[in-house]
Amino acid sequence: LQVQIRTNEFSGIIHASELFYFLDLLVWNGKEIAMALTIVVAGKGGVGKTAVAALLIELLSKKGIVLAIDADPSTNLNFALGLPLGETVGKAREEITEAIQKGIISPTVPKQDVLDMKIRQALVESDRIDLLAMGRPEGPGCYCAANHMLRLAIDRLAKNYDYTVIDSEAGMEHISRQTTRDVDVLIIVSDVTIRGIMAAARMQELIKELRTKVGKIALVVNRSKDGLPPEIQNAIREYGLELIAVIPEDPYIGELDMRGKPLVELPENSPLRQGVKEIISKLAL
């Protein structure tokens, strides 16, 4: 059985077995949309970037609906948020490729529409936070196809949310490969080391070399045990970084980790929670 389909983007004959793709897409594309504020949290590995991103997502969800994107292949954001890990973007990509090769999806069906539908199915939905995980790269040294899907997801999905918060992989690979179009706020997280500040400065320089537009770049120094040493303060000034928050070492994080609890259960007096509140206030998010 074949069905004639005619939309603004596609006109043609498909098999009846493929009709559910279009029914799903019509509902998806028919929603009224509004632009989201896009925030990227970046930093070298081991500085507590995901912890900052998780608390930022949780606190912003009290103000609006948040799309949380885990762009780190290690996919730890779901644990920090206390959410299950659903199908990843990379897995969805593999399923679509296999379905096309086996003829389950007709080559005449717009691939972008099918991608959009699969990305939506990969969303882990909760009350005020939806999570999309990037997952593993396509193969050794290649992240291109999955990155393209992530960009597609951001472009289409973000319009349905008040905030889009991206937990970037170390080095901001998705930005350097133009996965993210424009960013309203880039929060670079560093620890209290010269190496961390230098990495933050390199990220800031990388942004200036790319076509990606970034509205504001801000530095957050995490896990401070006793303020900032003069050497760190001098390095921040030397590299022209804008420091907006210094977050003390948080003893509650280790306690939650030992009990297998998510970071969003940090108490109100948690240094990390208070520090992220300061970030939101200073950036007027």
Language-model regions, residue ranges each:
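Cytosolic-facing regulatory segments adjacent to core modules
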Residues: 111-121, 125-126, 130-168
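N-terminal phosphate/diphosphate-binding loop that engages ATP/GTP or pyrophosphate donors
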Residues: 61-125
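Walker A/P-loop phosphate-binding motif and the immediately C-terminal alpha-helix
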Residues: 37-73
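Short hydrophobic targeting helices and cationic amphipathic motifs
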Residues: 1, 11, 22-25
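C-terminal boundary of histidine-terminating zinc-finger modules
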Residues: 260-268
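Conserved catalytic-core segment of NTP-binding enzymes
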Residues: 62, 145-249, 255
